């Protein structure tokens, strides 16, 4: 079984793990609905770029 020849230092370990992170979603304020939504996505009420593109279903 392979064994590392040298111990990995804290710096090298942290540099390697520096790319492992959670990205925050790009959230913007939607002036049409007055709510926040993720960029380049249709809002929950069916608006995209100020136009209604999808008619939302009624929640019963």
From Swiss-Prot:
Keyword Ribonucleoprotein listed: yes
GO molecular function, one term: structural constituent of ribosome
SUPFAM superfamilies in alphabetical order: Zn-binding ribosomal proteins (SSF57829)
GO biological process: translation
UniProt keyword annotation of Ribonucleoprotein present: yes
Gene Ontology, cellular component aspect: large ribosomal subunit
Keywords tagged on the record: Ribonucleoprotein, Ribosomal protein
Domain of life: Bacteria
NCBIfam families: rpmF_bact (TIGR01031)
Similarity remark: Belongs to the bacterial ribosomal protein bL32 family.
Annotated PANTHER family: 50S RIBOSOMAL PROTEIN L32, LARGE RIBOSOMAL SUBUNIT PROTEIN BL32
Name of the protein: Large ribosomal subunit protein bL32
Upper lineage: Bacteria, Bacillati, Bacillota, Bacilli, Lactobacillales
């Amino acid at each position: 079984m392979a064994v590392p020849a040298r111990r990995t230092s804290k710096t090298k370990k942290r540099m390697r793990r520096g790319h492992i992170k959670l990205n925050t979603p790009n959230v913007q304020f939607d002036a049409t609905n007055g709510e926040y939504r993720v960029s380049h996505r249709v809002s929950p009420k069916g608006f995209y770029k100020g136009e209604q593109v999808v008619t939302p279903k009624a929640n019963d």
